Amino acid sequence: MDQCIEIADEFLDEGIVTYVEDKNGKKQEYKAKDGKTDLKTVVLVNGNSASCSEILAGALKDNGCKLVGETTFGKGVIQSTAELKDGSALKLTIMQYFSPKGNAIQEKGITPDYEVKNPEGTETDKQLQKAESLF
């Protein structure tokens, strides 16, 4: 998570990057410091964008950055492993990530502003072309 926040610091004004919430509704916020770039930013995402990259994409989108590509993977939970006496283990979901505007990531992913598929086997990168057209 530290690396995610460090990257967010480069692009966002001071504020929430993400927050986690447990089953009881207890929230913990992760915030960026004031370090926003003045450069226009467009981010490419797809189904391989997961976990921390989704958190960053959600924070950027909620703060006005445009996303291009396909919906992200949808991995937005924190899990803990409990070892049992017989040597097996139990994995428990203990918290869920949300974007700054309260959008859940788990099983939904982050939807890009511009849905652009990039079919396998094509030489043209349609997602990159769309992103470039936004500058």
Where in this protein do the model-derived segments appear?
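Gly/Pro- and small hydrophobic-enriched strand-loop and loop-to-helix capping segments
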Residues: C65-K75
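Extracytoplasmic/secreted envelope proteins and their assembly/folding machinery
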Residues: M1-A8, T41, S53-A57, K61, ...
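Gly/Ser/Thr-rich loop/hinge elements
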Residues: M1-S51, F73-E83, M95-F98
